[in-house]
Amino acid sequence: MTFLAIDVGNTRLKWALYDAPRAGAALRAHGVEFLDHIDRLAEGSWARLPPPGHMLGCVVAGDAVKRRVQEQMEIWDVTPSWVVASAQEAGLSNGYDHPSRLGADRWVAMIGARQHVLARGPARPLVLVMVGTAVTVECVDAQGRFIGGLILPGHGIMLRALESGTAGLHVPTGEVRLFPTNTSDALTSGGTYAIAGAVERMVQHVIAHCGTEPICLMTGGAGWKVAPSMTRPFELLENLIFDGLLEIAMRRLAAA
């Protein structure tokens, strides 16, 4: 039974078709579409896919976008299913004040990250950084409890805020430098170091709270830009949200 995983972010939709709804399943096809173009999926890349037997996704872009995606899925006889954060799922417990208000992408990515940690050896605390339109920093203890996290503006949001509120800052994208000597590099370095500083603060909080060094993971389209500026090594992982969706789907089907 093939499995379609869908991740609808703030700017893009990513999808992946696997040979089964289980962790470690073989990838058969995948793609990315900007949200402006998702109404073409049924006549484009999805038209060439074998009908999926099961589907699970997460969406942060809102109900209107979700409805557009579901309309494209009408070419198949498959029921759309979307993850909503809950108090507990797939071995992860949710410490948010109101669990259902935690972003589905954050919840699913943490589930994928937790399984990645457990596959490597004994359970350890985890710091997960997702770098996209926004940046999130998630902290999970060794028992699998999400203990809290941060939401920061991503690079693009930071730069647009500065450009709209400050005269003379419409400059090309710069490079990250130790000591920037031009405005482009100063803006890029400032945004990167702001993210790196927030991440390091949360790592220190986890060490103090859990009494041990966490495993540090990073994902998201812009992760490769930020990772080199971290104060400690971060492992870059490409498909944590898909990994989380596979884990959730496998467990839900087994319990059905």
From Swiss-Prot:
<dbReference type="InterPro" id="IPR043129">
    <property type="entry name" value="ATPase_NBD"/>
</dbReference>
<comment type="similarity">
    <text>Belongs to the type III pantothenate kinase family.</text>
</comment>
<feature type="binding site">
    <location>
        <position position="96"/>
    </location>
    <ligand>
        <name>substrate</name>
    </ligand>
</feature>
<keyword id="KW-0630">Potassium</keyword>
<protein>
    <recommendedName>
        <fullName>Type III pantothenate kinase</fullName>
        <ecNumber>2.7.1.33</ecNumber>
    </recommendedName>
</protein>
<keyword id="KW-0963">Cytoplasm</keyword>
<dbReference type="GO" id="GO:0005524">
    <property type="term" value="F:ATP binding"/>
</dbReference>
<dbReference type="GO" id="GO:0004594">
    <property type="term" value="F:pantothenate kinase activity"/>
</dbReference>
<feature type="binding site">
    <location>
        <position position="133"/>
    </location>
    <ligand>
        <name>ATP</name>
    </ligand>
</feature>
<dbReference type="InterPro" id="IPR004619">
    <property type="entry name" value="Type_III_PanK"/>
</dbReference>
<keyword id="KW-0547">Nucleotide-binding</keyword>
<keyword id="KW-0418">Kinase</keyword>
<feature type="binding site">
    <location>
        <begin position="103"/>
        <end position="106"/>
    </location>
    <ligand>
        <name>substrate</name>
    </ligand>
</feature>
<keyword id="KW-0808">Transferase</keyword>
<comment type="subunit">
    <text>Homodimer.</text>
</comment>
<dbReference type="GO" id="GO:0005737">
    <property type="term" value="C:cytoplasm"/>
</dbReference>
<feature type="active site" description="Proton acceptor">
    <location>
        <position position="105"/>
    </location>
</feature>
<feature type="binding site">
    <location>
        <begin position="7"/>
        <end position="14"/>
    </location>
    <ligand>
        <name>ATP</name>
    </ligand>
</feature>
<feature type="binding site">
    <location>
        <position position="183"/>
    </location>
    <ligand>
        <name>substrate</name>
    </ligand>
</feature>
<keyword id="KW-0067">ATP-binding</keyword>
<dbReference type="GO" id="GO:0015937">
    <property type="term" value="P:coenzyme A biosynthetic process"/>
</dbReference>
<dbReference type="Pfam" id="PF03309">
    <property type="entry name" value="Pan_kinase"/>
</dbReference>
<comment type="pathway">
    <text>Cofactor biosynthesis; coenzyme A biosynthesis; CoA from (R)-pantothenate: step 1/5.</text>
</comment>
<comment type="function">
    <text>Catalyzes the phosphorylation of pantothenate (Pan), the first step in CoA biosynthesis.</text>
</comment>
<keyword id="KW-0173">Coenzyme A biosynthesis</keyword>
